Structure formats: C-alpha cells, structure tokens
A protein has these predicted regions:
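Soluble non-transmembrane domains of integral membrane proteins
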Residues: 2-243
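Active-site-proximal structural scaffolding
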Residues: 84, 259, 263, 306-309
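Interfacial loop/helix-cap signal at membrane boundaries in integral membrane proteins
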Residues: 222-276
Length: 311
C-alpha cells in the first residue's frame, strides 16, 4: 500500500511461478497500476492521487488511511484483507460538508493497469488477456483481445470490471453498481515489452458527501480458478450474483456446456486423487475420446472403406 493516494501499490500472488522462474507472481507494482478517486467540491475537485494519507489501526489484515483537509475534515480509505484473494475497501468523508458538493452523490474512479506478461509464450497469453465486465442485469462482456479499443462507452450498469490475463485477474467490484456510460480502454502492447495490454476504466459509483454511508468496493487479486471464483461471491458480502467464474474461458457455446457440467467435475475428481496436472489432462482427453467414439465410429468406418476402394 502507498500513502501517496492511499492505494494498493503492489500485488504478489504466492505459490504461482512466473515466466522468469520466480516462485510468486507479481500482478503489478509501482507505475504499472494507477487508481484515483475524484470527489466534486463546491469550487472544483479533490483527487486522492494528490493527497498523502496517514495509516492508523494497522494490523495483519486491516489498515485505515486518513487524509486531512483541515481540522476535523478528513477523507478515509479503510482496507480489510478477506480470506484468500479478496480485499474489502470502504471510502468515507468526515466533516467535509462545507467542502464537498452536497448535490453530487457520486465519486469518479480512474483505474489503469499495464497487464504484465506472465508466460513465456506471448501470443497465446495475449489472446486470453481481456478487459472483461459484468452487467448488473446479468452476463459478461469484454473488449476485443486483438484490436485497440479506446474509451468504449458501456451504456449498461455494471457490477465489476476485470483487468484479466490468461491465468490471473485484478477485479474491482462495486456494492451498488458503476452506473451507466462508463468508459473502458484496452490497447494491445508490442511483443518484447513484457506487457500484454494497457487497460483503463473510467467509472462512477455512489458516494455520500455527508459521510453517513461509506462507498464500498471489493478487489479480487488472484488466479482465474473456476471453483475459487465461485466462492468469491460469498466473500464479497454484497449479496449479488457476481458470476466471477465467467472469467474462465470455457470455449464456444457447445463446448462451454460440456466443460461446465462435465470436464470441470471430472477434473476436480481426478485431482482429488493427487495426480499431477499432466496426468489429469491425459486422462480427461482419453475419457472424452472414449465417450465420443461411438458418435464418430460410422464416419471412421466410412472413411476407411473409401480408402480401401480408392483405385
């Protein structure tokens, strides 16, 4: 965490190796990520990026950052580390009624990240690096993974935005929603730079200038693991059907159904025996071929007969 701006400055995901052989994956650090909250005042704006915060109530799992505008007038950002990979965040104002614009009940959020390359193969990893978002009415969508998209306007209300690479994601989740007409940007990076995409999200969510109700956000920094992402919904405590597991690509519609309701369960069952990943994948492949063989048997026999009869 950084006292300048009061934001997360570096995220390391333990027990996952990166392309350089490091035992832990650094999702981002320093200038690779920027997060700024902007509040409307009676004569302009206050941006957290311009403020220095003082930490207090520091424990192994919590910290409170406070920036003082004047005596008794403060902005507070509180972080609580949840189980696994979830970080709970609340933002509130105290005694700021004379400074903040009482007619503006939203906060502008500007979030940017350069998505770092984690795998040795750039092209394949880049194909699955996408800026993904979840609509409040249900379902997810994403910006193109191959072409440049700048300030794409999302008219629907959205619950979360994910800066995703192939195996890991940084996700921002709003307790209420991010309203309408948010803008999202995804710019592919050149091979050899060490980065996959430049992501940017300009969002807006509710904020109480009186300080009576804090703005609540959750951040997920972790692997794109189907079962784990399903569990995150209960950890967010927002009471929403977040569908974070949709961050895991399961293929085209037909294959998605097969993978969702068959392959994943078989995978869980086989890994429960302690087999390594390579063995599990081989067994699943053999099992799927065995199941589909009766369906393609006639085609194989017909093809074989044609080869025999061919002059």
């Amino acid at each position: 965490l950084n006292t300048k701006g009061g934001v997360v400055d570096k995220v390391v995901i333990n027990n996952f190796a990166d392309r350089n052989g490091n035992k832990n994956v650094t999702l981002f650090q320093g200038k690779d990520q920027n997060l700024n909250y902007t509040f409307a005042t009676k004569d302009g704006y206050i941006s957290t990026a311009d403020l220095f915060f003082t930490p207090s109530e520091v424990t192994d799992t919590t910290v409170t950052f406070t920036a003082e505008a004047a005596a008794g007038k403060t902005l507070t950002i509180k972080y609580v580390l949840g189980n696994e990979y979830m970080l709970h965040t609340s933002i509130s104002a105290t005694g700021m009624a004379g400074i903040l614009n009482p007619s503006v009940n939203t906060v502008d959020i500007n979030w940017q990240q350069r998505c770092a390359q984690q795998e040795k193969g750039f092209t394949f990893e880049n194909r699955y690096a996408t800026l993904t978002y979840h609509k409040s009415k249900g379902g997810t969508d994403y910006l193109s993974e191959t072409s440049e998209k700048i300030d794409e306007v999302i008219e629907d209300k959205i619950d979360w935005v994910a800066f995703k690479n192939q195996f890991f994601s940084a996700v921002m989740i709003a307790k209420t929603d991010f309203g309408t007409n948010n803008t999202l940007t995804s710019i592919p990076q050149e091979k050899g730079t060490g980065y996959l995409k430049q992501y940017k999200a300009r969002l807006k969510t509710t904020f109480d200038p009186t300080g009576a109700q804090p703005t609540q956000l959750d951040f997920y920094y972790g692997p794109n693991d189907f079962r784990l992402l399903q569990q995150m919904e209960s950890q967010s405590n927002f009471g929403k059907d977040l569908e974070l597991e949709r961050l895991v690509y399961l293929g085209w519609p037909l294959f998605r159904v097969i993978n969702r309701w068959f392959t994943i369960y078989v995978f869980d069952w086989l890994t429960g025996f302690g087999f390594n990943m390579g063995v599990v994948l081989i067994l699943i492949t053999l099992l799927l071929k065995g199941i589909t063989f009766p369906l393609v048997k006639k085609s194989y026999l017909s093809s074989a007969k044609m080869r025999v009869l061919k002059p």
